[in-house]
Amino acid sequence: MDRAGLEDHIRANPVEGSPAEMRAAFLRLAHPGGPPDLPPVDSVGGCDGRWFGTGGRPIVWLHGGGYVFGGSDSHAAPARVLADLTGRPVFVPDYPLASEHPWPAPRDAALAVLTALDRPDVVGDSAGGHLGLVLGMSRPHQMRRLAVLSPNTDRSGQSTTRTRNSDTDLMNDDAQDRRLSDMALGHLPDDDPKASPLLGDTSGLPPLLMAATTTEVLLDDTLLFAARAARSGVGLTLQVLPDLFHMWHLWPAATPEGRAILRAVADHLA
């Protein structure tokens, strides 16, 4: 499938409805060719998930999906590519999802995984990027390096691209992003750093790679956080890619930019 075909597939498969309906829709969206072959479910730190690849120091991929959908099944393709590029095992935990399990359930499950694996490298995309940043800020000693792709970092209203890019982002818009965030984090004030990591103390973060695209809703969430992290002395690598939709890396076989950012993540974690 090429880029045009992928964009048609995204338009034809909106992720909407109840949490159960969104989970099924996102899984169809993630795998245009049908359900993938998956490794068996394993458990790390009491959290189920799947390992992709084998080798040395583990990598934990905290998946996106607004804390409502997504999992080790939806993120099989990028996890496999990252495992191949690094020659290392990638564990994608199936942390508890909202609305059934709002915050702090996903944080607690992810923290148990990091504790069990003894300072792994961590990757997170979208809500998983938010999760990675919250853990990196509160428990920096429990990860070695961190890479986040289009993370949610701000509910306080500082971002302008949440509205400006809602018409140019095939995969996300501000209304949907807020709906998902309210389901998972709505009981937290918008200025709580657990809801808005942008407002927290970034000074203790491990070496950090951040990436986003110019036309996605969460561009400013990335740029504003990157600027704050840089000011606090964090070792930072920032990549901004032109003219792509949110979660472009989910289809590395269809987007050269998807594989390229996974190569950048692999280099950062080397």
Segments predicted by a language model, with ranges:
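A glycine/proline-hinged amphipathic helix-loop "lid/cap" segment
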Residues: 1-52, 270
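Alpha/beta-hydrolase superfamily serine-hydrolase fold, recognizing
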Residues: 13, 44-50, 54-270
